[in-house]
From Swiss-Prot:
Keywords: Carboxypeptidase, Disulfide bond, Glycoprotein, Hydrolase, Protease, Zymogen. Glycans are attached at N107. Gene3D superfamilies: 3.40.50.11320, 6.10.250.940, alpha/beta hydrolase. The linker peptide is endoproteolytically excised during enzyme maturation. It comes from Hordeum vulgare (Barley). It catalyses: Preferential release of a C-terminal arginine or lysine residue. GO terms for cellular component: vacuole. Its EC number is 3.4.16.6. The active site is at S149, D350, H403. One of its GO terms (molecular function) is serine-type carboxypeptidase activity. This is Serine carboxypeptidase II-2. Coiled coil: none annotated. InterPro entries: AB_hydrolase_fold, Peptidase_S10, Ser_caboxypep_his_AS, Ser_caboxypep_ser_AS. GO terms for biological process: proteolysis.
Length: 436
């Protein structure tokens, strides 16, 4: 991609966009946008970023407003450089997954109605294997998976598929070293329990509703809730009012576009429909930009796809999601045995997959503590959040961030990815003093 429309600056790095066919039979192809590292890409690791949903585009969120180098302008007609882009530290690959999300497609129409966890992991593994044939310089390069929200399923499931593929075939071209997930759907029981507790302790819902949620919704699947649970979720949404459940202390986007999304837990299963801060309407800007014909042409989008309206999140995929594991904790146990670097992080103002949910899920893993709970500090010497190290897993909170941590706290998110990739703890005050 030489340039994208509305790019009024020169980029110091190369970037590529296009498709990889993951099934000839189904005519299924996944869309990617790949950014080389800004400096010395040959020495930097490869990173895959996935957004959640299920049904949300990593191009819309990951590139357009979170960790990508190009963020969409408020007029939806151009892009500006993100000073905290993660391609400062890695070569970063964004994938629209599964088929039917963003610019990804399938010629088999039934595919869009039959997506689920298992096929998503299989297709993503095929994607990576074929993508590395196209970019062979990244074969055996240190490789990490990252993502947020429903990627709490995608990422560990894909990591498991990669490790099992290694064992079955001896193919080591995907050199997976670890993964990191944020505000991640992990375990339905602990996630629900943590959400209801968070909503109650932050004063969003009444005592009575809190009790009813725990009775009727705790043991529910995230994707398939019962009518009884739905009814109480509606009450909880009404009580909480018109706030952004993805970032409970910041203003909502005041436009017709935003009205449905601010219903707290109205649709818990849309765990990837991101909240957006500072400019609470960032998602709206992406809708304008990625529907522009000239943008689609620059990104080599299939012209047939360009004829239908591009969406940040697909309601059709979300409502027709087939298999959804109730818990991925058993996968964590398996992957910890492989010695992978595993980090979880939480923006602490998200009510959709809040910090409490992740803490309950980690507690259920019963891992011994290696480094006790303590504050970590950003470059300005302010508390960036809190962290605890376990045997096989590291947990980090990001103070004041919502569901999309890199959108709300971009500087702190860059510190987070730097620490993760270096395999070192989050900085403490003494680190900052020694740097002065």
């Amino acid at each position: 991609v030489p340039r994208v429309p509305g790019q009024a600056f020169d980029a110091s790095f190369a970037h590529y966009a296009g498709y990889v066919t993951v099934s000839e039979d189904r005519g299924a192809a996944l869309f990617y946008w790949f950014f080389e590292a800004a400096h010395d890409p040959a020495s930097k690791p490869l990173l895959l970023w996935l957004n959640g949903g299920p049904g949300c585009s990593s191009i819309a969120f990951g590139v357009g407003e979170e960790v990508g180098p190009f963020h969409v302008n408020a007029d939806g007609k151009g892009v500006h450089m993100n000073p905290y882009s993660w391609n400062q530290v890695a070569n970063i690959l964004f994938l629209d997954s599964p088929v039917g999300v963003g610019y990804s497609y399938s010629n088999t129409s039934a595919d869009i109605l039959s997506n689920g966890d298992e096929r998503t992991a299989k297709d993503s593994l095929v994607f990576l294997t074929k993508w590395l044939e196209r970019f062979p310089q990244y074969k055996e390069r240190e490789f990490y998976l990252t993502g947020e929200s429903y990627a709490g399923h995608y990422v560990p499931q894909l990591a498991q598929a990669i490790k099992r593929h290694h064992e079955a075939t001896g193919d080591k071209s995907i050199n997976l070293k670890g993964y990191m997930v944020g505000n991640a759907l992990t375990d339905d029981f602990h996630d629900h329990y943590g959400i209801f507790q968070y909503m109650w302790t932050t004063g969003l819902i009444s005592d009575q509703t809190y009790k009813l949620l725990n009775i009727f919704c705790d043991f529910e699947s995230f994707v398939h809730t019962s009518p009884q649970c739905d009814k109480i979720l509606d009450i909880a949404s009404t009580e909480a009012g018109n706030i952004d459940s993805y970032s409970i202390f910041t203003p909502t986007c005041h436009s017709s576009f935003a009205s449905s999304r601010n219903k707290v837990v109205k649709r818990l299963r849309s765990v990837g429909k991101m909240g957006e801060q500072y400019d609470p309407c960032t998602e709206k800007h992406s809708i304008v930009y990625f529907n522009l014909h000239e943008v689609q042409k620059a990104l080599h989008v299939n012209p047939v796809i360009g004829k239908s309206k591009w969406e940040t999140c697909s309601e059709v995929i979300n409502t027709n999601w087939k298999d959804c594991e109730r818990s991925v904790l058993h996968i964590y146990h398996e992957l910890i045995q492989y010695g992978l670097r595993i980090w979880m992080f939480s923006g602490d103002t998200d009510a959709v997959i809040p910090v409490t949910s992740t803490r309950y899920s980690i507690d259920a893993l019963k891992l011994p503590t290696v480094t006790p709970w303590h504050a970590w500090y950003d470059d300005d010497g302010e508390v960036g959040g809190w962290t605890q190290g376990y045997k096989g897993l590291n947990f980090v909170t990001v103070r004041g961030a919502g569901h999309e941590v890199p959108l709300h706290r971009p500087k702190q998110a860059l510190t987070l990815i730097k620490s993760f990739l270096a395999g070192r703890p989050m900085p403490v005050l003494s680190d900052l003093r020694s740097d002065m």
